[in-house]
Curated annotation (Swiss-Prot):
<keyword id="KW-1015">Disulfide bond</keyword>
<keyword id="KW-0813">Transport</keyword>
<feature type="disulfide bond" description="Or C-5 with C-33">
    <location>
        <begin position="5"/>
        <end position="32"/>
    </location>
</feature>
<comment type="function">
    <text>Required for the transport of riboflavin to the developing oocyte.</text>
</comment>
<comment type="similarity">
    <text>Belongs to the folate receptor family.</text>
</comment>
<protein>
    <recommendedName>
        <fullName>Riboflavin-binding protein</fullName>
    </recommendedName>
</protein>
Length: 35
């Protein structure tokens, strides 16, 4: 199963790491949002 993100201006096409994320650090290794 491929993982994808919700459609929207603030979401990426697919999850990727966001090491600078301040909140939801559980998802910092695979995030749909930009940190």
């Amino acid at each position: 199963k491929k993982y994808s993100c919700l459609e929207g201006e603030t979401h990426k096409l697919k999850p990727s790491p966001e090491p600078n994320m301040q909140e939801c650090t559980l998802y910092s290794g695979s995030s749909c949002c930009y940190a």
